[in-house]
Amino acid sequence: MPDVLNLVEAWIYSLANLMPYLLLSIYPFRHNFRFPRFIVWMFIALIGVIQIILGTWAAFFPDTPSSIKSIVSTVIYIAFYFAVIKAHFGKMAFTLLAMSNICNMIVAVSKCIEYRILPEMAMQGYRWSFTVIMIVVEIIVLVPLYFYFKKVYEPVLNQETGQSMWRFIWVVPLTFYIVWYYIA
């Protein structure tokens, strides 16, 4: 039976590794929801609970291949994203894949920093040290990204000119996503 502290560590990590990216990826499309905001927030809460369950599964049942857990989480996230947002496929795919790549980068950078600071703890899974470092890196990266989304990215998404570029530009972050998937 896992102890309470390890359980809380897994839960905090699970939410810290999902919620900032989920919220930031839907931010530019906040005026294009298919459902009322209350329903969207209910879906977000449900995804948070599912992510906690998946994080607990990953932390305390390490014999299960991590690719299965990753695929389940990814499919749920993609299904939510495309079910809740009503926008051009290319715009949504580009945003979702770019945010996923940023998430992967933040996780990798955080693990490297943890290894430099606390090498013994870096070899263990779901440790508070990694979660704290990851949250600090998220703040450093995602706060400026939020302002970029607000001032630059969202107005570009709302422009009517250049719509044809969105048909193919999502392939660029997809390429990086595939590379991340096979390297990790």
Q: Whereabouts are the PLM-identified features?
A:
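Hydrophobic transmembrane alpha-helical segments in integral membrane proteins
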Residues: M1-M19
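Juxtamembrane segments at transmembrane-helix boundaries
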Residues: M19-I39, I53-A184
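N-terminal, Lys/Arg-enriched amphipathic/low-complexity engagement segments
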Residues: I44, G48-Q51
